[in-house]
Amino acid sequence: MMVEDLGVEAKEAAVREVAKLLPLPELLQSISSIKADYIARQQANDAQLSTMVAEQVEQAQAGLESLSSSEKTIYELRDNFISIDKLCQECQTLIDNHDQIKLLSNARNNLNKTLKDVEGMMSISVEAAAARDSLSDDKEIVNTYERLTALDGKRRFALAAAGEEVGRLREYFEDVDRTWETFEKTLWGHVSNYYKLSKESPQTLVRALRVVEMQEILDQQLAEEAAEAEGEGAMASVANPRRPGKKSTTTSASSKGLAQQKLKVQGKGYKDKCYEQIRKAVEDRFNRLLTLVFEDLKAALEEARMIGEELGDIYDYVAPCFPPRYEIFQLMVNLYTERFIQMLRLLSDRANDLTNIEILKVTGWVVEYQENLIALGVDDSLAQVCSESGSMDPLMNAYVERMQATTKKWYMNILEADKVQPPKKTEEGKLYTPAAVDLFRILGEQVQIVRDNSTDVMLYRIALAIIQVMIDFQAAEKKRVDEPASDIGLEPLCAMINNNLRCYDLAMELSNSTLEALPQNYAEQVNFEDTCKGFLEVAKEAVHQTVRVIFEDPGVQELLVKLYQKEWCEGQVTEYLVATFGDYFTDVKMYVEERSFRRFVEACLEETVVVYVDHLLTQKNYIKEETIERMRLDEEVLMDFFREYISASKVESRIRIMSDLRELASAESLDAFTLVYSNILEHQPDCPAEVVEKLVSLREGIPRKDTKEVVQECKEIYENTLVDGNPPKTGFVFPRVKCLTASKGSMWRKLT
């Protein structure tokens, strides 16, 4: 009835729905489209309804299956409970046979264990063969190692449990030992081939190093276990100090066990072996180079260059494959450097057979190697080990000695040529010879060559060699200067003055450029300054020799002989002398630089003063009023002449001694003598009392007693000024006065 009611309700609902859809007559035309839409919806509803019905059917089937399974399980549980009840009843009857059951159980367990051990022993050869087969694949090296390590574990366990059967068990592990040998040969082959593998198959190298690391860890673990076992044994011996029954056998067994433990504690040492393999590989890499050193230097240096460049690849490819704590790049740098030092020592053994060009090629390669290391981040001090190891010393010695010999031969030829060839003139008329410029051009070239092609230590050696060359050159020039001035001549001496001043400037330039190129630690050991000043000393000597040329002039000698004689008193000496000086000064001023000319004038003035003082002390005529007046006029003539060339203060400071001696010669009393002499000692502290004695002896009318008193008083004044028996300083006059030099020794003996 309910179904019929539902049908009626559905029909009425449908009529209402149609009435809503067709409220107007003109909408009857759309009945066909409405009908089509209705059919489509009906089909969709049918499909959805079919799907829902199917799902409900499947769920009902699953529920039936679960119900059936549950029923089956319940039946099984019921059977099990029944079996348990039966077994419990049976066990109640076995309590009386418990001991026999326990023995049977133990026997069964032992049998199972024995079978398992036998199976394990029988599998050793199979596992060893499998490990050996896996060695053919580089990718399996770690797995192979793990298999072999597992076999080693079995061996340790078996040998520990075997007791007296150890000898019989060892043969089962011989195959394992052979496999280990093959494995280690493969492993160390990979390590030795580190350079090639790092580029072509880095993963193979990494796996090999992983094995090394794993073995190191295992060695550490075994060492710790052995240490713990040893500690436990020691504690046991402390806890049981008296065991008289089995002392000897127990002791021997324990000592043997300890020996085996110590052997195990040492481990395989794979890391050390890894380093050793690398060292051997490096040695093999250098074998060809160390042979080429004796056969073909060019090929040897090319080979060395190629080997040195490998360090870049080692930095980029090899080092990343190794654990950082191995510091493999630093190790490689040390190993390579050691071998290169060996190469340099072999080359040094035949240094005399190598040309300078070949030596420079060797040092040039060392520079390249050092720069390569520095570019790779190696510290400068470590990069320079090759050059500072001493291995290059014979090479550098040979180069430096040849350079010094060649340079010396050259400048000696130049100096000999200067003796016969007239000096050249600049546009300003200054005299010179090419020796100075040529010498420093050659020395500068040597420095530049070494800077461009060699090491810091080689440049340091060249700097020292150049200093020695300059010292030798100065010595050769001094030898030339020491020749009689008249033999040398005015113009060559003027050229020598200019040359040495030019040498000083060039030497300072070379010094500055060389010291700038040297590292500070080497620059501090090189003293160019004193050597450079040596050229100024030679120039100074040449200036004095130029003055001697004037004073050795026959015309000048003729005038000087007349000093303090009749012609001198008549004004026929000093006036003519300064006129001659004027002629010479005109030439010298044109020939030399202004600074040298002023020094020349000062030297000439000093020599003039010395000559006048010397002649004053050696002349035999009594000093009269006209003598004193002429001396005063001489001072004026000399003052007027020399201050045309140098400052008046310099002239006055040098002429002053002539004025003081004039006053001393004209003194009338003891106080006057001592006062003037004291004034002289203030600016000429080396003026001996003998000067007073000579001048007093040339005075008329002074009694002998007064003369002795004056001399004695002056000697006491002089002695009081001495410091440690010597004058506080030396002046320019009295050490050069000839008449005093001859009697100086006896005078000093009297004073002391």
Curated annotation (Swiss-Prot):
Chain segments carrying region Disordered: 229-260
Domain of life: Eukaryota
UniProt biased composition (Low complexity): 247-256
Principal localisation: cytoplasm
Deletion phenotype: Male gametophytic lethal due to defect in pollen germination and pollen tube growth.
GO biological process terms, semicolon-separated: exocytosis
Location of this chain's protein in the cell: Cytoplasm, Cytosol; Cell membrane; Cytoplasm, Cytoskeleton, Phragmoplast; Secreted, Cell wall
Record key words, sorted: Acetylation, Cell membrane, Cell wall, Cytoplasm, Cytoskeleton, Exocytosis, Membrane, Secreted, Transport
Keyword Repeat: no
In-chain residues carrying the UniProt-annotated modification N-acetylmethionine: 1
GO cellular component: cytoskeleton; cytosol; exocyst; extracellular exosome; phragmoplast; plasma membrane
Family that this chain belongs to: Belongs to the SEC6 family.
The protein's assembly and partners: The exocyst complex is composed of SEC3, SEC5, SEC6, SEC8, SEC10, EXO70A1 and EXO84B. Interacts with EXO84B and KEU (via C-terminus). Binds to EXO70E2. Binds directly to B1L.
Role played: Component of the exocyst complex involved in the docking of exocytic vesicles with fusion sites on the plasma membrane during regulated or polarized secretion. Involved in polarized cell growth and organ morphogenesis. During cytokinesis, involved in cell plate initiation, cell plate maturation and formation of new primary cell wall.
Protein name: Exocyst complex component SEC6
